[in-house]
């Protein structure tokens, strides 16, 4: 799976992971939420089970709590289905309708947010208050070769960056000055959202553990939505000046 915090892609070639799992008779499960079936098809690459948060990019409007899990093996699929029905995990008809509605526009939303995200990542790379930027299609991305092999030209909509001033105080100033961008540990909405892994998704780790992962107090994750790129850069320009 792609990394929730860093937005980096597969650290090892998936073909190697598939071979290892087959050798050890282990089922390979891939979380495809960040990349979606539009950019990557795990089963075609050898995965046995795929999970995806429909709440995020697929439905795309932050108004459903839904996900799916599907397996290659029909017996495994039957076990999953029986468990869901037995434990009452079936979603409401209304949520299913909302998700189906979102799927109608998913291809358009994906292409638009991905295109904006790439331009946005390049903009951040030139900002004097930003120390580093992680986006899969940037040539300086640590996993650039694996990205091209796994995702082709797709970079998807997630951008991560780190402030030059890596203190919590600078991070707080930045967030307070960033108007019109929701501060929320979610992703995939039509509106751009910002999250701070050190105080949200990775808050349960020690500081040393976070630093090992490359997550400092100045590290942020952006889920790029459907706004015009000029609107995003203007807002981030103003906020970054306060760091």
Q: Over which residues does each language-model region extend?
A:
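A common structural junction motif
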Residues: 87-88, 177-186, 239-243
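Catalytic PLP-binding core of fold-type I/II PLP enzymes
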Residues: 11-49
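Structural motif of enzymes handling amino- and sulfur-group chemistry
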Residues: 84-163, 167, 171, 178
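Active-site PLP attachment segment
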Residues: 43, 47-98, 102-106
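PLP-dependent enzyme catalytic core of the Aspartate aminotransferase-like
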Residues: 14, 165-169, 176, 192-243
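Single conserved hydrophobic/aromatic residue that forms the stacking wall/gate
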Residues: 1-10
């Amino acid at each position: 799976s792609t990394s929730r915090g860093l937005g980096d892609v597969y650290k090892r070639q998936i073909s190697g992971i598939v071979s290892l799992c087959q050798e050890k008779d282990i089922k390979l499960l891939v979380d495809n939420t960040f990349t979606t079936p539009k950019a990557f098809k795990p089963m075609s690459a050898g995965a046995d089970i795929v999970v995806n948060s429909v709440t995020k990019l697929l439905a795309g409007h932050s108004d459903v709590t839904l996900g799916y899990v599907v397996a290659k093996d029909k017996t495994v699929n039957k076990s999953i289905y029986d468990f869901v029905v037995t434990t009452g995990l079936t979603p409401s008809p209304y949520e299913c309708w909302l998700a189906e509605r979102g799927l109608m526009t998913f291809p358009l939303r994906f292409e638009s947010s991905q295109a904006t995200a790439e331009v946005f990542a390049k903009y951040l790379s030139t900002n004097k208050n930003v120390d580093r930027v992680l986006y899969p299609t940037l040539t300086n991305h640590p996993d650039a070769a694996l990205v091209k092999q796994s995702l082709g030209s797709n970079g998807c909509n997630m951008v991560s960056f780190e402030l030059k001033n890596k203190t919590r105080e600078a991070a707080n100033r930045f967030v307070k000055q960033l108007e019109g961008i929701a501060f929320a540990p979610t992703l995939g909405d039509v509106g751009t959202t910002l999250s701070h892994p050190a105080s949200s998704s990775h808050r349960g780790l020690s500081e040393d553990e976070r630093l090992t992962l490359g997550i400092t107090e100045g590290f942020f994750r952006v889920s790029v939505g459907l706004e015009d790129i000029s609107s995003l850069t203007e807002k981030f320009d103003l906020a970054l000046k306060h760091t």
